[in-house]
Amino acid sequence: MRILGIDPGLTRCGVGVVDVYADRSARLVDVQVVRTSPTAELHHRLLAVGDGIEELVERHRPSVVAIERVFAQDNLSTVMGVAQITGVALVGAARRGLDVALHTPSEVKAAVTGYGQADKKQVATMVARILGLDELPTPADASDALALAICAGWRAGMSRAGIAGTPTPTARATGADAASGAGPTAAQAAWLAAERAQRGRR
């Protein structure tokens, strides 16, 4: 499964493309950070980020788009920018008929590190290890986008294997994946526990 992860931001938007396989291994395809000037007009900035995402979607043809879910922040201008870019990304995915996976930062951290409160360096370190990279992906927007893609791929894979229950819209069953029978990694098991705990608080 090829997944395009988006760490939404108006000044810097991380976009990472990852192939995730039935055995839960993952391979880096591409990663970029789309940047806009804070002094540019808002509509031009939104267009620039949208065009950057669209270019990578066109080039790599993902089957799923994974986006960080907007959550409350004290900085209103920051959360507004994140929400605006999230909207741009969602519209682009809908136009192409792509599945969308939304994950909170704590879900992503738990998926790749086993700890929902991991810091940026811990996330980048685990992303590099999972993808077999010689160096940590930088800046943080890039590693966060890759972590989102990995999280979405592992969740879809676990849903297919019946580990996480009912498949989500991002999980389209294939016989090869269902037959693999591989259990979750330690990080995946921790993510599942975090997800169940979150559901219990709803």
Curated annotation (Swiss-Prot):
Its EC number is 3.1.21.10. It catalyses: Endonucleolytic cleavage at a junction such as a reciprocal single-stranded crossover between two homologous DNA duplexes (Holliday junction). It is an enzyme of class 3 (hydrolase). InterPro entries: RNaseH-like_sf, RNaseH_sf, X-over_junc_endoDNase_Mg_BS, X-over_junc_endoDNase_RuvC. PROSITE patterns: RUVC. The active site is at D7, E68, D141. Binds 2 Mg(2+) ion per subunit. Keywords: Cytoplasm, DNA damage, DNA recombination, DNA repair, DNA-binding, Endonuclease, Hydrolase, Magnesium, Metal-binding, Nuclease. GO terms for biological process: DNA recombination; DNA repair. Its cofactor is Mg(2+). GO terms for molecular function: crossover junction DNA endonuclease activity; DNA binding; magnesium ion binding. SUPFAM superfamilies: Ribonuclease H-like (SSF53098). Mg(2+) 1 binds at D7, D141. It is found in: Cytoplasm. CDD domains: RuvC. Mg(2+) 2 binds at E68. Homodimer which binds Holliday junction (HJ) DNA. The HJ becomes 2-fold symmetrical on binding to RuvC with unstacked arms; it has a different conformation from HJ DNA in complex with RuvA. In the full resolvosome a probable DNA-RuvA(4)-RuvB(12)-RuvC(2) complex forms which resolves the HJ. HAMAP family: RuvC (MF_00034). PANTHER family: CROSSOVER JUNCTION ENDODEOXYRIBONUCLEASE RUVC (PTHR30194:SF3). Belongs to the RuvC family. NCBIfam families: ruvC. This is Crossover junction endodeoxyribonuclease RuvC. The gene is ruvC.
